[in-house]
Curated annotation (Swiss-Prot):
Residue ranges, annotated region (Disordered): 1-34
Comp. bias intervals (Basic and acidic residues): 14-32
Biological processes annotated in GO: amino acid transport; sodium ion transport
Annotated protein name in UniProt: Putative sodium-coupled neutral amino acid transporter 11
Superkingdom of the organism of origin: Eukaryota
Family: Belongs to the amino acid/polyamine transporter 2 family.
Lineage: Eukaryota, Metazoa, Chordata, Craniata, Vertebrata
Species of origin: Mus musculus
Residues that carry a glycan: N438, N443
Function: Putative sodium-dependent amino acid/proton antiporter.
UniProt gene name: Slc38a11
Compositionally biased tracts (Polar residues): 1-10
Keyword rRNA-binding: no
Length: 453
């Protein structure tokens, strides 16, 4: 987009409430064309994207009561850091995350941010391939006359075919605007999926035994759970685009938009995480759809919707990775031939890695702790602390001082725990409660089931 952030009059040494109400792009006479409601929709869609499928798993990792508290905490920090980024842009006179970090920490900071902004969507592409293979393989198994054990409906074959026929061609577009309708379609499909998860929480949940520690307050893997939540909530890479698209954008207006967006998003996320975890408790997988029985046609439809959602979202992530490489190494300009070659190389690399990984949970954890956590917790707070001349007792500075070490702990400890204490998954296996002899589990203890299944 052509919007430019002008230099502000004065260094903004004191960001008071009155200055927050002033336009931060006063040099841009007309601003963008997006309404506040459209901006809210864009932010909500960014948050409740494909990462929402792992939120019930994060409840299993952290313990349900602590997991809900952590979900609210991550949402609050996301809210705060999104506002902090725009304030940092105002202080530095920049209009993008990259230019903000470059202005604040120079070229080394720019390279670090670029690395994170490449890694996050690239690992997301890997997770999308895993989800596509897991979900669509079970969809095709329900088709009449299809051999459930056939190689042509195996997850590996489906990943390769969906890549060649769908995600790669879509990833070759040079203009991301051509993918503009994807966000609306994805939001509709995500709403359908939420409805299915809620329905099965009521109809299926009471028939599945609860594990012994299902309602324990906290579990040792809470740090990894924060990583999964961070993966779901991150939308910082496009906040400057949304802000710049507003008519007469101001910090006060942006703050209202973010508060509304995060409030809606956290309501949906808590509902999804609660319904998913209540249904399966300690059996919850990183990919929630792995928990449902293959014979459940309603869930099969949900799998189809989710598979389509991630296929449509995949090209956007590829666009980001390609743009990062183009900006860092080629000055932002690629020839048509090299654009195609680079897209093919990125998609091929993501596909090869996804074929070697079975469990979605570890991918969500690593992407959350290695990429999402620094992009949400560390970098926004570091930029603001260096740029702002507010007193140390100012509430924003206090919060930024808390966010920075918390993000560092989540990143380091979460990575170590994800590697040294990986969680098992039952990829490709039918869960025990799906077999005919276990049709009803009401008033049945889990310890008894362990002896009989």
């Amino acid at each position: 987009m052509s919007y430019q952030q002008p230099q502000l009059s004065g260094p903004l040494q004191r960001e008071t409430d009155s200055s927050d109400r002033e336009s931060l792009i006063s040099g841009h006479e007309h601003g963008g064309k997006s309404s506040q409601s459209a901006a809210v929709f864009n932010v909500v869609n960014s948050v409740i994207g494909s990462g929402i499928i792992g939120l019930p798993y994060s409840m299993k990792q952290a313990g349900f009561p602590l997991g809900i508290l952590l979900l609210f905490l991550v949402s609050y920090i996301t809210d705060f850091s999104l506002v902090l980024l725009i304030k940092g842009g105002a202080l530095s006179g920049t209009d993008s995350y990259q230019s903000l970090v470059n202005k604040t920490f120079g070229f080394p900071g720019y390279l670090l941010l670029s690395t994170l902004q490449f890694m996050y969507p690239f690992i997301a592409m890997i997770s999308y391939n895993i989800i596509t293979g897991d979900t669509l393989s079970k969809v095709f198994q329900r088709l009449p006359g299809v051999d459930p054990g056939g190689w042509f409906i195996s997850r590996h074959f489906i990943i390769v075919v969906s890549t060649v026929t769908c995600t790669l061609p879509l990833s070759l577009y040079r203009d991301i605007a051509k993918l503009g309708k994807i966000s609306f379609i994805s939001t509709i499909l995500t709403t359908v999926i939420l409805g299915i998860v809620m329905t099965r929480a009521i109809s299926l949940g009471p028939n599945i035994p609860k594990t012994d520690n299902a309602w324990v307050f906290a579990k040792p893997n809470a740090i990894q759970a924060i990583g999964v939540m961070s993966f779901a909530f991150i939308c910082h890479h496009n906040c400057f685009l949304v802000y710049g698209s507003l008519e007469e954008p101001t910090v006060a207006k942006w703050r209202r938009i973010i508060h509304t967006s995060i409030l809606v998003s956290v309501f949906i996320c808590v509902l999804f995480a609660t319904c998913g975890y209540f249904t399966f408790t300690g059996f919850t997988q990183g990919d929630l759809f792995e928990n449902y029985c293959r014979s459940d046609d309603l869930v099969t439809f949900g799998r189809f919707c989710y598979g389509i959602t991630v296929i449509l979202t995949y090209p956007i992530e590829c666009f980001v990775t390609r743009e990062v490489i183009a900006n860092v190494f080629f000055g932002g300009t690629l020839s048509s031939v090299f654009h195609t070659v680079l897209a093919v190389l990125i998609v091929t690399a993501a596909t090869l890695v996804s074929l070697m990984i079975e469990c979605l949970g570890i991918v969500l954890e690593l992407n959350g702790v290695l990429c999402a956590a620094p992009l949400i917790f560390i970098i926004p707070s570091a930029c603001y602390l260096k740029l702002s001349e507010e007193p140390r007792t100012h509430s924003d500075k206090i919060m930024a001082c808390v966010m920075f070490p918390v993000g560092a702990v989540v990143m380091v400890v979460g990575f170590v725990m994800a590697i040294t204490n990986p969680q098992d998954c039952t990829h490709g296996q039918e869960m025990f409660y799906c077999f005919p002899e276990n049709v009803s589990f009401t008033n049945t203890s889990w310890s008894h089931l362990q002896l009989t299944t």
